[in-house]
Structure formats: structure tokens, C-alpha cells
């Protein structure tokens, strides 16, 4: 309970504010309240306070280069993720689209805290639920496709249908190619492809 004192008081303690801010500093994707809103006297104030602390902390952090590099480049997957974020900045892309079976690609991109929205496109309800808690990611349901090109085309179609992109927009697509990725069962386990596409 990060703002525990707000169960009974309209303002948190300084230590509680520091706890929330430190969670953001540490790269936490999601923070939540429990007793403060379930049984507290000031549930609305608690939500506003937590949101305010998170927004102020992120606003401060985004000025630091380390904030966007926090994902770290440890392997090919993370190198592709870092490259996708860098490319999206350089080409002034509208968003980053991640066709994914497991949600791993979207999580990988999220680690680098891009300035653009990340759209996870998955046929898996499980993956969609998981990505809801990842920083900066919004998930949408797609249909199962056989090839990488069909998967990417389908993801762009879903993005257009939801009004996420429009004709002429540049988008960065990052995914795993099942032809060249090591796989485990039906799940692609390696992110190894990034491309830029213009919406037609």
C-alpha cells in the first residue's frame, strides 16, 4: 500500500511520496492502489495524488538520456528493440507497431521508454491481457496469420480500422520472423526484424 496513510488522511507522508517516485525511477511499468481506494476515506484524492506523483516524476526523468536507455542492449533482441526506437525518432514515425504472439516484443520496446505510442497486435487474448500492464503499450486483437508479411499487413489493417494511423503516416514495425527465429511450440521467441512502412 504505497499511500497507506491516505486511508485516513487527505495527504500522503513524504516517505510515501518518495516510495512512489522511486518505483517510477526504477522503471516500474504499473503502480496501483488497494486499501486506499477500497476502504479509504479519500479514494479520489489518493488516485489523483498517485497519478500526480507518477506524472511529475516521469516529466523529470524524460529529460535524462539514461531514462530512454534503461532497457540496456544485452542481446540481439534488445539491440533490435533499441534500433526500432531510434529509427522511430529519426524518421518522425507516428507509432511503433509490434505484431506479437506472446507480448514479448512490445515489452522489449517498452523497456526503452519511446516517446511514441506502442501498439501490440496479437491473436492471443493472454498476450493482450499481459501487455495492458506494460508502460506505453496499447493492445489490439488480430487474426492468426501464416507469414511475416501477412502478419504485418494484418497489423497495419487493424491499426487503420482503430484510427491509430492514417494515410501517409510512417510507422515502425518490429516483430519476430518465424522463418529465422528459434521457436518454442507455437510462440516466436526472438524479435529479429524492424522495418519502416508508410500507410497507404
Question: Over which residues does each language-model region extend?
Answer:
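C-terminal helical cap(s) of enzyme catalytic domains, especially alpha/beta-barrels
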Residues: 37-59, 185-196
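Beta-strand/loop-dominated core regions that host nucleotide or nucleotide-derived cofactor-binding catalytic loops
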Residues: 138-141, 153, 157, 182-200
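Glycine-rich phosphate-binding active-site loops on the catalytic face of alpha/beta enzymes
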Residues: 20-43
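Conserved, mostly hydrophobic/aromatic
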Residues: 1, 23, 109, 171
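Nucleotide-binding motor/catalytic cores of P-loop/tubulin-like NTPases across gene-expression machines
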Residues: 105-107, 113-150
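Long, charged amphipathic helices and adjacent flexible linkers at domain junctions
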Residues: 49-85, 193
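Flexible glycine/proline-rich, aromatic-decorated loop/lid segments
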Residues: 6-28, 53
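Flexible, glycine/charged-enriched surface loops at secondary-structure junctions
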Residues: 34, 59-70, 94, 165-170
Amino acid at each position: 500500500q504505497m499511500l497507506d496513510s491516505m486511508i485516513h488522511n487527505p495527504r500522503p507522508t513524504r516517505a510515501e511520496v518518495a516510495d512512489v517516485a522511486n518505483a517510477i525511477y526504477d522503471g516500474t511499468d504499473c503502480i496501483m492502489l488497494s486499501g486506499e481506494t477500497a476502504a479509504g476515506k479519500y479514494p479520489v484524492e489518493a488516485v489523483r495524488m498517485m497519478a500526480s506523483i507518477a506524472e511529475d516524476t516521469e516529466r523529470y526523468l524524460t529529460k535524462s538520456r539514461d531514462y530512454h536507455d534503461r532497457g540496456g542492449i544485452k542481446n540481439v533482441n534488445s539491440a533490435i528493440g533499441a534500433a526500432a526506437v531510434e529509427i522511430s525518432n529519426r524518421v518522425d514515425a507516428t507509432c511503433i507497431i509490434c505484431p506479437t504472439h506472446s507480448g514479448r516484443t512490445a515489452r522489449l520496446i517498452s523497456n526503452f521508454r519511446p516517446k511514441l505510442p506502442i501498439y501490440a497486435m496479437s491473436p492471443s487474448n493472454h498476450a493482450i491481457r499481459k501487455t495492458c500492464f506494460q508502460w506505453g503499450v496499447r493492445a489490439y486483437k488480430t487474426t492468426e496469420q501464416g507469414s511475416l508479411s501477412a502478419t504485418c499487413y494484418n497489423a497495419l489493417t487493424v491499426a487503420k480500422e482503430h484510427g491509430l494511423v492514417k494515410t501517409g503516416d510512417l510507422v515502425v514495425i518490429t516483430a519476430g520472423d518465424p522463418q529465422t527465429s528459434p521457436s518454442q511450440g507455437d510462440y516466436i521467441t526472438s524479435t529479429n526484424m524492424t522495418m519502416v512502412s508508410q500507410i497507404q
